[in-house]
From Swiss-Prot:
Residues 1-21 are annotated as: Disordered. HAMAP family: Ribosomal_bS18. It comes from Methylibium petroleiphilum (strain ATCC BAA-1232 / LMG 22953 / PM1). Keywords: Ribonucleoprotein, Ribosomal protein, RNA-binding, rRNA-binding. This is Small ribosomal subunit protein bS18. The gene is rpsR. GO terms for cellular component: cytosolic small ribosomal subunit. It comes from the Bacteria.
């Protein structure tokens, strides 16, 4: 008799288990720029841009920050401009 559908050869579920407790306490994400009434993001505002860059230097995705798509596109463009003008580093690790 074949194993039940959705499970592997030995009856184990292939999908990783999620922590159900963390799902209960998840805070609702909101767009910071919409709440404050910002119409355009400035590439010279480095303090704001740093909040949306991860520790490894990557731009944090909108699904984690809650930023609307309109502002996420502006944000990524501004971060890239600030990096090009040396206002922000490309990565966090610089070998000296």
């Amino acid at each position: 008799m074949p194993p039940p559908r959705g499970k592997g050869r030995f009856g184990k579920d292939k999908r990783p288990k999620r922590n159900t407790q963390s799902l209960l306490f998840r805070r609702k994400r909101f767009c910071r720029f919409t709440v404050t009434g910002v119409t355009e993001i400035d590439y010279k505002d480095v303090d704001t841009l740093r909040d949306f860059i991860a520790e490894n230097g990557k731009i944090t995705p909108a699904r984690l920050t809650g930023t609307r798509a309109f502002f996420q596109r502006q944000l990524s463009t501004c971060i890239k401009r600030a990096r090009f003008l040396a206002l922000l580093p490309y990565s966090d690790q610089h070998k000296s």
